[in-house]
Amino acid sequence: LEQGYDTSCGMSVVATALDLYWGEPATETGIITATLGGAVDSGLYTVSLADMAAAFAAYGVAARAFKLDWEGLNAVVAKGYSPIVVHYERPERHFALLLGFKGGRAVTADPARGLESLSREAFETRYSGSAMALASKALSVDGALVDRAVAEAAGRHERLESAASRFALRAGR
């Protein structure tokens, strides 16, 4: 789901994870209202991982924050914990969902940029090292949807690379 406000990426990530991947109806505005106590009109929606964990808990999803590097994120995804909330520091503070890895690339659902396939270097340039794993006894993630999103982003990247290679070959003639 695309974030509706300049500073609402955290609540948009919560709504996307719940609504799209966990199948629990949720909206960004509803999460903001419930979590920030009616502050929808204030325009101030910047939140922390702790605020996001509280929002997830209200829907029966446990959230635990970790400091993880690239390998640690790969290990958590390999154990079936996907999507994972990731925090970016660059180019500005921001939250996204890490859906998985394919072909040495991280696939993210970014509330401002959409579905992305990022090289390790591009991901690590943005990533702060803070992530949050999610789990629930009552709800389950639509793993097939996560897998399709990862495959779609990876396929899009492969098609772009192929087109760029063909263009470079033609330009070199």
Regions found by a protein language model. Name each.
Residues 2, 24, 28, 71, ...:
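Glutamate identity and glutamate-enriched acidic tracts
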Residues 1-40, 158-160, 170-173:
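Active-site-adjacent structural segments surrounding the nucleophilic cysteine of cysteine proteases
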Residues 129-173:
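Low-complexity, Gly/Ser/Thr/Pro-rich intrinsically disordered linker/tail segments
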Residues 34-136, 141-144:
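Conserved active-site-adjacent core of cysteine acyl-enzyme catalytic domains
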